[in-house]
């Protein structure tokens, strides 16, 4: 028993020593603590500052997502459930906007027809930059039940770029909430300032 404790103590001491050696050999600038972010390149103070700037910008963007509702069919009812008190989208910073010029996210919910496709593209183009799209339901994802109809667009991704697909017919409000949380994770990984610096 005593020898097992000594062996375990020796192993933990070796691990601690190797961790300290790795930390001392890293090329982090003096006075700057590494935080474990995947975008940190400690070779430059400017890159460190831009990584922190990206973190702050991403925190602000993912904490205040303003979606535009583009409800075309029965999936829009589940989008309304998402706004109701049971799921309380406001606690995630999601507030519906009525104008595309004030929105940074669009929920495409329902069947997109060929005649509606130009309007969808026009609305998407009116949104300011840093814009995202959540395609909600099988009809918006790929045509769904009406896939082979002559007047149906087989997925809104043929007209606008889609960031998150929420499956279901219709998807539940929990599924839409999960899609919003996945979008927040995607926003958290953005690194615009660092890419600008490296150009």
UniProtKB/Swiss-Prot annotation:
Keyword field: 4Fe-4S, Electron transport, Iron, Iron-sulfur, Metal-binding, Mitochondrion, NAD, Oxidoreductase, Respiratory chain, Transit peptide, Translocase, Transport, Ubiquinone
Domain of life according to the entry: Eukaryota
Reaction it catalyzes: a ubiquinone + NADH + 5 H(+)(in) = a ubiquinol + NAD(+) + 4 H(+)(out)
GO cellular component: mitochondrion; respiratory chain complex I
Location of the protein in the cell: Mitochondrion
Molecular function per GO: 4 iron, 4 sulfur cluster binding; metal ion binding; NADH dehydrogenase (ubiquinone) activity; quinone binding
Cofactor, free-text remark: Binds 1 [4Fe-4S] cluster.
Alphabetical list of Pfam families matching this protein: Oxidored_q6
Transit peptide residue numbers: 1-16
An annotated GO BP: electron transport coupled proton transport
Its job: Core subunit of the mitochondrial membrane respiratory chain NADH dehydrogenase (Complex I) that is believed to belong to the minimal assembly required for catalysis. Complex I functions in the transfer of electrons from NADH to the respiratory chain. The immediate electron acceptor for the enzyme is believed to be ubiquinone.
Protein name listed in UniProt: Probable NADH dehydrogenase [ubiquinone] iron-sulfur protein 7, mitochondrial
Organism lineage string: Eukaryota, Metazoa, Ecdysozoa, Nematoda, Chromadorea
